Amino acid sequence: MDPNQHNPPAGHQIVHVRGDSETDLEALFNAVMNPKNTIVPPSVPMRLRKLPDSFFTPPEPKSHSRQASTDAGTAGTVTPHHVRAHSSPASLQLGAVSPGALTSMGPANAPPQHLRQSSYEIPDDMPLPPGWEMAKTPSGQRYFLNHNDQTTTWQDPRKALLQMNQAAPASPVPVQQQNIMNPASGPLPDGWEQAITSEGEIYYINHKNKTTSWLDPRLDPRFAMNQQRISQSAPVKQGSQLPSSPQSGVMSGNNPIRLQQIHIEKERLRIKQELLRQRPQELALRNQLPTSMEQDGGTQNPVSSPGMGQDARNMTTNSSDPFLNSGTYHSRDESTDSGLSMSSYSVPRTPDDFLNSVDEMETGDTLGPGSMATQPSRFPDYLDAIPGTDVDLGTLEGESMAVEGEELMPSLQEALSSDILNDMESVLAATKIDKENFLTWL
């Protein structure tokens, strides 16, 4: 078979047409337009689908009846229960045991007590409590109906009666032992009352706020502290001072530690204030020199404006920090990516950009003879207004500063090495930069 037979040439398309495509498409439209004419395949009836009987029986409302008690029992309180579990020791419920019986097992001299009546099946001839009725499920499991509150339960109420009857004669012994072993002996606080439930559990009633509690109020540390202070104090009326005295004692004990923490916080705040106070000075020092150079390059006759030195001198004399004073000069914000960054202003080496600008100001084409005469008197005054700059003014000095220049030159010649001098010569011999291209922003 030729393989090229199934591969059409480029640019040609093969359309396959099926014989029943039109009929299938018409059938789809007819099924939507005429739904009555369509034949729906019969489905299996619900009764023949092998579903359980409970699927067809609607749930009955939860009510007090024997029919509804099989499914509508108290599911929240029912524990995993087997059919014959009520006759085994596993049916012992720890919640039904009174706290007095549990506390009686704590002391070593107390005899062990075994609740044997809950480990065997209760005979059927024993009468149920008033208002109770016993019934059986279809599977034969027994449950109990409480007509008093209209509830059903799996637990036999006769077990609680037997446990309460056995715990009743033994209850005075745990109470006496509790009074001996527990320091919470004595009368109850004012407004409290002790009571016992039907299952033998002891609880306490607070008549002041009409609440009940399982906790003995005599075990409350606040009540014990108040009783101790009342017994130790004289009959002086100090009721209003009792609640505040523990807090005052705690504060007096922690007073030196609190003072030390406050002192440390003050030191931290003082250091932060010093750093914030030094930060504007550094930023202004970094940005003032490039900003002034930009102003000199942007004006038509930069050297012939003698007011700049006077303003700078006024800024230094009017306040301790000339850069924090509000004047007519606006400094540029700090730019980390600028080519004119003065981040190395503390280095003794003279910046290259500054030397280029000085050379340009000396040999500019637009400078006249009159403006050259005013330059030595203006430029040093401007540099004097900037604190902390290590700029050599030997090349800019006039006749008035010749004595100071002679004093500085020997020390500079001794400190400079041949490498630094070669770098200075290469910088000075470089091509002059135009004023328009002097400031290059990156």
UniProtKB/Swiss-Prot annotation:
Subcellular location: Cytoplasm; Nucleus; Cell junction, Tight junction; Cell membrane
Tissues where the protein occurs: Expressed in the notochord, brain, eyes, branchial arches and pectoral fins.
Pfam families: TEADIR3 (PF15238), WW (PF00397)
GO process terms (BP): blood vessel morphogenesis; BMP signaling pathway; brain development; cartilage development; cell adhesion; cilium assembly; determination of heart left/right asymmetry; dorsal/ventral axis specification
The keyword Transcription regulation is annotated on this UniProt entry: yes
Keywords recorded for this protein, A-Z: Activator, Cell junction, Cell membrane, Coiled coil, Cytoplasm, Membrane, Nucleus, Phosphoprotein, Repeat, Repressor, Tight junction, Transcription, Transcription regulation
Composition bias, Polar residues: 288-304, 313-329, 337-347
Any single GO CC term annotated in Swiss-Prot or TrEMBL for this entry: chromatin
Protein name according to UniProt: Transcriptional coactivator YAP1
Coiled coil feature spans: 258-279
Residue(s) carrying Phosphoserine: 21, 69, 87, 119
PTM annotation, UniProt: Phosphorylated by lats1 and lats2; leading to cytoplasmic translocation and inactivation.
Keyword Transcription regulation belongs to the record: yes
Protein family membership: Belongs to the YAP1 family.
SMART domains in the record: WW
Domain WW: start-end pairs: 126-159, 186-219
Biased composition (Low complexity): 238-249
Role description: Transcriptional regulator which can act both as a coactivator and a corepressor and is the critical downstream regulatory target in the Hippo signaling pathway that plays a pivotal role in organ size control and tumor suppression by restricting proliferation and promoting apoptosis. Required for expansion of the neural plate and neural plate border zone progenitor pools. Acts as a direct regulator of pax3 expression via interaction with tead1. Plays a key role in tissue tension and 3D tissue shape by regulating cortical actomyosin network formation.
